Amino acid sequence: MRLGFAGAGGDALSYAVDLGLPPPKPPSAFNRDPEVKTEVIWSGPVPRPAARLVERAGAALRVRDGRGWATVGRVLPPWTSMLTEYADPQAAPEMLTLRDAVRAWRFYDHFRCDVQAPARAPQLGSRTPVLSGDGHDFAAALQTINEIGDAEALYAAVADAFDGAQVAVQISDDGRFEVTMQQPGMLRPLRTAELSDGTLRFLMWAVALLTPRPPPLMVLNEPETSLHPDLLPALGALIARASRETQLIVVSHAMRLVAAIEDAAPADACQRIELEKSLGETVAQCHGACDAPQWHWPER
């Protein structure tokens, strides 16, 4: 299996890793675990010999040293990446730069909204510019947007989605934060524990997308789950807005959401890639939209 990505820009860092099965000897219960065969960091889109900055072959690692190479006197375990095993800001600053960039990526797969979900309970709060994957810091993240983020955009998105509703953060005497929602016609605000699954999930998506610290890449998996169809246009507008500051990959089965994103985003800012099954294999049906940057896999 091979994984890789190219950085944006002509001199940006690119990375590739090639994984395979280990040799059968010595015998081990883990002989089915993949191991790293090669890893390469290079500058630009193509891993030409002159563009390579760091190379790994099996357990051996070498880094660029002027016009030549310097071998790192350290044996790398075959089951771990060189990005986690070696860090030297002098000899290989590219590894630290790349590692920090990858760590900044955010993946949101599923926000829990069940009765026992962490987001439904009051939680101790501290400044939270990035919403966690399980949503336990939901109230603190919303309050952080109130203080240092685009609170106006948050309030506008909620009002648009829920017919003029307003959200607020209540803070108890012991420092616990809880989100409340005031809807027109209701005599009192609803606590987080009283919100429907779809309402809570939309609010969490809004907080994640309006983060005061946008990442270089954010991936959303089926954000339409549990949402009422009438909420999808508002969610699409939020996603389109967030795409101004970060690269977004959205995996969705809801064509209404896809259409809402395309309607809200600039014409050249959105690329649709449709997937279909062909003899049990998932393939991309791009119809000319998948013209990717030039890419070459490094050889083993």
Where are the regions that the model predicts?
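Short beta-strand micro-motifs in enzyme catalytic cores
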Residues: 1, 106, 177-179
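Short beta-strand segments that buttress and anchor functional surface loops
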Residues: 1-8, 181
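Electropositive, glycine-dotted interaction segments
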Residues: 6-156
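Short, mixed charged/polar active-site loops
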Residues: 10-14, 187-189, 281
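Short, low-complexity Ser/Thr-rich regulatory SLiMs
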Residues: 19-23, 171, 276-277
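Conserved ABC ATPase signature
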Residues: 143, 152, 156-159, 163-210, ...
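A residue-level structural signal marking coil residues immediately N-terminal to beta-strands
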Residues: 215-216, 246
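C-terminal lobe/lid and adjacent interdomain/linker elements of RecA-like ASCE P-loop ATPase modules
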Residues: 233-300
